[in-house]
Amino acid sequence: LSLSLQKIGGSSAIFACKPARLPSPFTIFVFNISNRNDDMTEYRKPTPAEIEALTAAGNSAENWDAIEVAQNFTPAQLSGCRLEGRVQIGRGARLRRCTIRNYRIGEEALIEGVTALECRRESSFGNGVRVAAINENGGRTVRIYDRLTAQTAYILAVYRYRPEAVEAIERMIERYAAERRDTLGTVGPHARITGARFIREVNIGKGATIDGASLLENGTVCAGAYVGIDVQARDFIAAEGARIDGGTLLERCFAGECCTLDKHFTAVDSLFFANSHCENGEAVSIFAGPYTVSHHKSSLLIAGMFSFFNAGSGANQSNHLFKSGAVHQSVHLRGCKFGSGTYIMAPAIEGPFTLVLGRHTQHHDTSAFPFSYLVEQDGRSALMPGANLTSFGAVRDIGKWPERDRRTVKRDRINFEEDNPYLAGGMIDAVNTLNSLAEAHPDAESYVHNHALIRSTQLQRGLKLYNKAIVASLGAMLRNGEPGRAARAAGTMWRGNTFPAGR
């Protein structure tokens, strides 16, 4: 996530104008607004003969005059249904053994065995819901909507020192939520809803599937998303291709494109972005950037920011320091991993691609040292700078992420390149920091930097690893950049200490 934000978060020019005149980068995140109902079907009232046939098939209506059907409607489309309030039934839609109140049913949709599909009041269907991500007390609240991106959410949560920009984006989201408000819910074309119990104030997108959900309330299930057995979700949005299954419990959550939440996972006030996969455990007030992964029952992710992350069994954090309350937060930069049994007491921060092992209670800040190991030694947090540069696990992770990208819309901007200015610059800063420590105390056996212990031998090893990696990274960026591609095409690319013949 950090890599994908450099072009946005790293430039102050994007906020140089007045909030009311935010430039185009924000319009693509927020103002991709389509009409609330783009169904062009012409509807009519059912004829007396059709009403008689419908009644004979076990159907009933609170008021048949409030029911509208497509021009080519046939009574065979309904069986054993109760219709209340205003209901529109699209071409070829099939309704079996269900109760429907105040809904538009798209063409070829299937609704079968549903206790109640109802819109009881005017609703924005999850758009505009406030999610207390990162900080459990709401200091970094993000308002969700069905086209939310990781980039927009990041700016809303992190750029609190730019209040005018945050307020401007929130106003845009508020207008978007107002545009979505309606007294009728929508079931999109070719959607399938089977075996569900209570679905209330939920918009269901084209081709979405709801199979056996227990309770869905005030939300949006976007096109192609799947909601399965025993799921309970309130104030939520499931983006395109998201899969929520296996008794998952959600409250005030956003599940991004192609996210998977499964196997009794529980989440409150959390954001999950592209291709994240969480099972069994729980999450509270987290910002889960793309590819955040947690598979184990005993894992708790709380009050933090993650991306390209993997939590081991029993991984845990604490954001509550008793007298001060649950006001703290942690940041685990791109590519961090927690080993089994890892514990971190917030506030704390780790640099990109850091492997964390053991218990850490001293509120470390290792953000200046990418590709490191942070381990527990004699009750202290010991840092091994650059140690992860020698791990094949990091190489494997970097290679597998683009291969596992299942998205079609690709609303989140993700940079998969491992050789980039963000990481190269981080390693250069790490070398400068290590050299400063060594020069200040050349004979020391160990150093302490931001509550992390660094052994002298590990410092020297880290310098060697970082310097090698910097050279390799800069070479790769030059080779893969536009000048490098042009040089290769012309046969003038420098390789090692030789040039092509004749140069």
Task: Name each model feature, range by range.
Residues 1-2, 13:
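Short, low-complexity, intrinsically disordered N-terminal modules
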Residues 9-10:
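Residue-identity detector for glycine
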Residues 21-39:
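Short, Lys/Arg-enriched N-terminal segments with co-localized hydrophobic residues
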Residues 41-64, 95, 99-177, 211-214, ...:
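Glycine-rich hexapeptide-repeat left-handed beta-helix
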Residues 187, 191-225, 229, 235:
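Core alpha-helical transmembrane segments of integral membrane proteins
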Residues 443-503:
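C-terminal non-catalytic accessory extensions
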